[in-house]
Amino acid sequence: MSDTEKDKDVPMVDSHEATEEPPTTSTNTPSFPHLAQEQAKEESATLGAEVAHKKINYEQEAQKLEEKALRFLAKQTHPVIIPSFASWFDISKIHEIEKRSNPDFFNDSSRFKTPKAYKDTRNFIINTYRLSPYEYLTITAVRRNVAMDVASIVKIHAFLEKWGLINYQIDPRTKPSLIGPSFTGHFQVVLDTPQGLKPFLPENVIKQEVEGGDGAEPQVKKEFPVNLTIKKNVYDSAQDFNALQDESRNSRQIHKVYICHTCGNESINVRYHNLRARDTNLCSRCFQEGHFGANFQSSDFIRLENNGNSVKKNWSDQEMLLLLEGIEMYEDQWEKIADHVGGHKRVEDCIEKFLSLPIEDNYIREVVGSTLNGKGGDSRDGSVSGSKLMECVNDAVQTLLQGDDKLGKVSDKSREISEKYIEESQAIIQELVKLTMEKLESKFTKLCDLETQLEMEKLKYVKESEKMLNDRLSLSKQILDLNKSLEELNVSKKLVLISEQVDSGIQLVEKDQEGDDEDGNTATGHGVKRVGKEGEEVGEGDSIAKLQPQVYKPWSL
């Protein structure tokens, strides 16, 4: 191999090695830190230039973030039903009904109560309910997660529940009102009434007298029986039938209870069963009012009557006590009494049980007791044998029917009643007379007031007339002074008042009548004379308007 070939081969190897070495050196950045820094600067500069050339679209970025957030939202697992009467609701807007129902958030009364705060709270409550629409959403659960005052939360919660936007399709058994411990019967509550409100119950006292004894026995007071639940009617066939059964067998019996799906009340007599939703039952009231949702119709329900024999007929001590309490509280309002007893008891059951109670009659016992004491019967324990009891009853009836002083008592009673009515009528008549006298006095006082007012008006008119007369005299005096001054100035015209013209006309007429009387040619011919202003006798004639009519004008120069 020649030297030239060697020389040619060596550079080829060197060039190959040279070309392969740079990648190894570029990957080993620690060996050349200054090269890595320069490369990073160049990359950052190129990226900055690319970002400067590209414009950022914020709407697209926000949409991308929303799409990413949608991945973490809870999926809808239950169908949500909105009632037909709340079809105006739109979760993205605030309706006018909401503004009228919650005006605190829309009148700028507080900086914490704004439309945005209302909308956020409303949407949070609705979305929380829609996560589990079959469970009741309470106010406490909302309070724990919403930073708002309690009054506003209660208002919004009540508004949404009223319009069926929340708690519309819940299970009635999840309502807080139905959650509670079951009745065990060991708590007995007795009705306590103040002493002033208790009804008067006459004490059943039987006076006992012992004939032929050394001394009289003390009176024994038999108190009125308050706790009547210990007594039982042994002639009740249904109760006897229930008494024959064992308690263990009664406890094993299954008593079905049908609860209304809408209101949560118990449907006792009649229920409406849904043919499409087999677990849904409605009471008669909710069915008649149409509270069965928008996705059902009335034809989807069938009317079923509960079996009355399945209702529990026997009465417990607690129910008997509640019945007596209800009768004492509500008297003859049997519907309220049945509600007070509760359970499966109807109005008919309460009335039937009350009639079957062995309540004793105090009046008959008083008559029987007095008769027994009169005959010397044994009445220590209040119990009498059959024959003695019949004799006492017959004697009591005869004493009541054969009363000798009945007519006298009736006449005395009627006389007392008539006297009472006469006294009342006299008092009423006296009151009427007194009222009429007061009425007349008030009228007289008003007349006196009117009379004094008239007198004051009369004095006022007299003063005004005097004032006008003085003004007239002063005015005539001024006119005379003016006429004198006009005469001094050789002015032929004079000032004359209208009233003076009338007076001058009257004087002229009087002078003419006087001349006619002297000539014997009087117009009237009566021959009556009268004295004028200057003491001359003037004959009385006709009126001035007929003799010499004149047209008067206001005075002027």
From Swiss-Prot:
Q: Where along the chain is composition biased (Low complexity)?
A: 21-31
Top-level division of the source organism's lineage: Eukaryota
Give the start-end ranges of region Disordered: 1-44, 510-544
Q: Where, per the database record, does this protein carry Phosphoserine? A: S485
GO terms for biological process? chromatin remodeling; double-strand break repair via nonhomologous end joining; nucleosome disassembly; positive regulation of DNA-templated transcription; regulation of DNA-templated transcription; transcription elongation by RNA polymerase II
Give the subcellular location: Nucleus
The SWIRM domain, residue ranges? 80-177
Annotated residues that bind Zn(2+) are located at C260, C263, C283, C286
Q: Which SUPFAM superfamilies match?
A: Homeodomain-like, RING/U-box
Q: Which chain positions lie within coiled-coil regions? A: 38-77, 462-494
Recite the UniProt keywords alphabetically.
Chromatin regulator, Coiled coil, DNA-binding, Metal-binding, Nucleus, Phosphoprotein, Transcription, Transcription regulation, Zinc, Zinc-finger
Q: Where is the composition biased (Basic and acidic residues)?
A: 1-19
> Where in the numbering of this chain does the SANT domain appear?
310-362
Query: What name is this protein filed under?
Result: Chromatin structure-remodeling complex protein RSC8
Taxonomic classification, please? Answer: Eukaryota, Fungi, Dikarya, Ascomycota, Saccharomycotina
